[in-house]
């Protein structure tokens, strides 16, 4: 009971100016993270410069939980590149390797077929109904670098959202009750 | 300033920074490796060469692939992904690349190999342009590191030609 009284006292004793300072510092941290993310999007030319590998279709090269750094340049798509693409109607991007390229003479448009290294068949089963080839606008970026295991944090937070809430709650509590 | 929480936080930040730095250096060291891979591909046999019901040409080949990719492996290499692609041009398409075979090489010892197989993936054209077509066979490789930047390169072998008539 005395502990509850102490907490109530400490919340009552927060001055309004101190509260604003803390809120603004928190806001600055969140905003600078956002700035860094948007700057990365600009530099790499891709809508999502970092992706987490979610499935085992590219093993043993990329395992579930690895993160990939993407880059999208105007260079034409060529066989062997590892590309990240979105299928129409699905929002989870897929990371697979290009195995076939047919590039048109005049327009430079390109038909692309992909396949996961660890899959038996190509990706036609994953494409939209009746779609045989991917086109340039489906491709979000090429994988240029990779870091192992770092993506598990994101996977855990997505699959067990309760952990995300616990973390944010604990962070919020820490901010409110800290002395400086 | 000296509470457990502060110390744990400082330690964790420092550890993560050092880890990131080590990963970057490991990846950077890959730039200094001396690479001289070699390969040869022979077409042993054209198994069949037909026009499919909906109009596209398809050919099935038996290939003899000899390669030595051992110099591509560094201490930071997890695997090398090698594949052979047929590359040619047609009147409609400026470039066609069709992957015929690929393999994952997990270790340096497996990187010097000799293999005779028929094409793993179907060699299908967009159209019926393959009769008498000259094409290149290119061995591509993709070095996937334990951490950091991936490297890719290729050897182009030209002078291959498909027969003038279906069989």
From Swiss-Prot, chain B:
What does the subunit comment say? Component of the signal peptidase complex (SPC) composed of a catalytic subunit SEC11 and three accessory subunits SPCS1, SPCS2 and SPCS3. The complex induces a local thinning of the ER membrane which is used to measure the length of the signal peptide (SP) h-region of protein substrates. This ensures the selectivity of the complex towards h-regions shorter than 18-20 amino acids.
- Superkingdom of the source? Eukaryota
Q: Which residues lie on this side of the membrane: Cytoplasmic?
A: 1-11
Q: Which keywords label this protein?
A: Endoplasmic reticulum, Glycoprotein, Membrane, Signal-anchor, Transmembrane, Transmembrane helix
Q: According to its UniProt record, where is this protein located?
A: Endoplasmic reticulum membrane
What is this protein's name? Answer: Signal peptidase complex subunit 3B
Q: Name its GO BP terms in alphabetical order.
A: signal peptide processing
What InterPro entries does this protein's entry cite?
A: SPC3
